[in-house]
Design a protein with these regions (language model features):
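General beta-strand structural signal in soluble alpha/beta enzymes
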Residues: 13-15, 37-42, 65, 130-132
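Short acidic, glycine/serine/threonine-rich loops at helix termini
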Residues: 24-27, 50-54, 74-79, 140-144, ...
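Conserved anion/nucleotide-ligand pocket segment
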Residues: 51-109
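Rossmann-like dinucleotide-binding domain that binds NAD(P)(H)
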Residues: 95-137
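Rossmann-fold NAD(P)-binding glycine/threonine-rich loop
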Residues: 17-36
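Single conserved hydrophobic/aromatic residue that forms the stacking wall/gate
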Residues: 1-11, 169-170
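C-terminal substrate-binding/catalytic lobe of Rossmann-fold NAD(P)-dependent dehydrogenases
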Residues: 121-130, 134-168
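Short, ordered loop/turn segments at secondary-structure junctions
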Residues: 16-20, 43-46
Length: 171
């Protein structure tokens, strides 16, 4: 996390999901105590952050985080079991470090992101879902009680979340 002031407000940017998975309750409580807004930089959570600014929470039916399915999408467990580390590191859409690429290939990353979303947005676990969107263009979906769906879409790039987090342009 890094902290800055902008227009009289205090912001923290969060790029490490593991800290929120383990200490999310405490981190969020500290942010609330210090009147600090935590701004996620991860693409899925940034897309939820921007979308939830305009949605009344009581209108939410379901929230979807998207996953590309990684290099093993569509394979059986037997086929995956026989894959090499090198094959797991060959993500079809994202250029990431080794740890997150392996976490993505095994979907562990998506499990972390569900916990992260619960903490960041005070969402009940039963609202949270994962859907495979192989092109990595849809970053999150919010289904409303009236049946409509809000989608946050962009090319698979971290440029928008990073630019927002670094510049603190207010959405």
């Amino acid at each position: 996390c890094s902290q800055s002031r902008g227009l009289g407000d205090v912001y923290k940017r969060q790029a490490n999901k593991e800290s929120l998975v383990v200490f999310g309750k405490h981190i969020i409580a500290q942010c609330e105590t210090s009147n600090t807004e935590l701004i996620p930089i991860d693409s899925e959570h940034f897309s939820l952050f921007t979308a939830l600014k305009n949605i009344e929470r009581t209108n939410i039916s379901r929230v979807f985080l998207t996953a590309s399915g990684g290099p093993f999408r569509g394979l059986s467990m037997d086929e995956i079991f026989n894959k090499s580390v090198e094959e797991a590191l060959n993500h079809p859409n994202w250029d990431m470090g080794s740890k997150i690429t392996i976490d993505s290939a095994t979907l562990v990353n998506k499990c972390f992101e569900l916990v992260e979303a619960k903490h960041l947005f005070s969402l009940e676990p039963d609202l949270l879902n994962i859907v495979v969107q192989k092109q990595s263009i849809i970053h999150s979906l919010i289904e409303l009680r009236d049946g409509s769906v809000e989608a946050q879409m962009s090319k698979p790039s971290m440029i928008i979340p990073l630019a927002f987090g670094l510049s603190l342009i207010h959405i």
